[in-house]
Every structure is written in structure tokens, then in C-alpha cells.
Design a protein with these regions (language model features):
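Cytoplasmic membrane-interface "Motif A"-like loop-to-helix N-cap segments
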Residues: 70-83
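Hydrophobic core of transmembrane alpha-helices in multi-pass small-molecule transporters
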Residues: 19, 88, 100-117
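Helix-loop junctions on the cytosolic side of multi-pass membrane transporters
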Residues: 128-129, 175-190
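Helix-to-loop junctions at the C-terminal end of transmembrane segments
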Residues: 59-73, 161
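Cytoplasmic helix-loop-helix junction between adjacent transmembrane helices
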Residues: 107-148
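C-terminal ends and interior cores of transmembrane alpha-helices
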Residues: 83-98
Length: 190
């Protein structure tokens, strides 16, 4: 049985949000890598942006997990953190070519601190959506969103960058993360 809804709307909404956020996340790193190189002509810029975003995400996990566990409304915290992550990605995009690399790395580090909302923060909400035997099925489907995003995100980044430019690829990644916000906000209904 699905949580409080017998038709599975909660799980479908959860999975749609997870897929969008994770595709945007998996797209953001390669898009920033491509942007750094496209704008500066130096491969080190792109790889530095990717490294900064990634390292901060790993460091931010325990911090975000503790906040989420203590939150009275984890759905709202998750939604706000998704918005902050998307805005951080956009800020990096806007600063590339305008600021020196140390400043770019600092912005990417700050943005990356919000990355755990897309991964563990989202998955931690699954028991709010499904319970009992459906939790196993929901967990398997949730895991599939990681796999699908890890395949689609980089390909989408390359396709958008080749078609419209690297800046557009970064903005598309941020838009995908933002598309997940309504799903995150709706988690309190289940």
C-alpha cells in the first residue's frame, strides 16, 4: 500500500522531483567543466570548478543531514536548499570570465555545500511518502533515479553545450534542480 494515498501519487511526485533534481545535479558538474574551458580557454578552470563543487558536496553531507534531522519541516528545508543549490550554480555561471579563479572556486564551494539535498537529503524523505512493503519498491525506484541521472546528466550537458553553449548548459542544470522544488514542498502532504 502506498503511504496515505492508495493510488501512488506521492511516490510518483517524489520520483519526478528526485529525477529532475538529480539530472540537474549530474549535469551541473560537466556543464561547469565545459563552461570554464569555453570561457577561459584553460582546462584548469573547468576542472577547478568541478572539483570545488564536488568536494564541498562531500563536506556538506553530514552538515545537511544534521539540519534535516532536526528540522520540524524537512520538506521546506529541502526545497530551500534545492533553490540555494540552483542559485549557486547560476552564480558560478555568471562569474566565470569576470572573476579570478580563487573567487570562482569559493562560489563553487559554497554552491556545493547545498548539493547533499539532491542526494541523501532527498532519499531521507522517502519514508514520508511510502511505508511498509512499498518502501522496498520505493527505494529501488529511487535508486534508479540516481542511475538514470548519472547517464542522462552528462550527455545532456554535452548536448546543450554543443547546441546552444556552455552557459546554457549550466542554466539548464539549474532549471532542472529548480523543477524539483514543488515536489519537495509537497512531501509534507504524505
Amino acid at each position: 500500500m502506498f503511504s496515505r494515498y492508495t493510488d501512488g501519487r506521492g511516490l510518483r511526485r517524489y520520483l519526478a522531483g528526485a529525477a529532475a533534481a538529480r539530472a540537474g545535479d549530474e549535469m551541473s558538474g560537466p556543464a561547469l567543466l565545459l563552461l570554464g574551458f569555453a570561457v577561459t580557454g584553460r582546462p584548469g578552470t573547468g576542472s577547478g570548478l568541478l572539483a570545488s563543487l564536488t568536494v564541498a558536496g562531500a563536506a556538506g553531507g553530514p552538515w545537511f543531514g544534521a539540519l534535516l534531522d532536526r528540522s520540524r519541516r524537512p520538506d521546506r528545508l529541502l526545497a530551500r536548499t534545492l533553490v540555494a543549490y540552483a542559485l549557486g550554480i547560476v552564480a558560478v555561471q555568471a562569474a566565470v570570465g569576470r572573476l579570478p579563479m580563487p573567487a570562482l572556486a569559493a562560489i563553487a564551494l559554497l554552491a556545493g555545500l547545498f548539493n547533499p539535498a539532491v542526494t541523501g537529503g532527498w532519499t531521507a524523505q522517502l519514508p514520508r511518502v511510502v511505508t511498509g512493503r512499498e518502501l522496498d519498491r520505493g527505494s529501488a525506484l529511487d535508486a534508479l533515479t540516481f542511475s538514470a541521472a548519472s547517464l542522462a546528466g552528462p550527455a545532456l550537458a554535452a548536448g546543450v553545450a554543443a547546441g546552444v553553449g556552455a552557459r546554457a548548459a549550466v542554466l539548464t542544470a539549474a532549471a532542472l534542480v529548480t523543477l524539483a522544488v514543488p515536489s519537495a514542498c509537497s512531501l509534507s502532504r504524505y
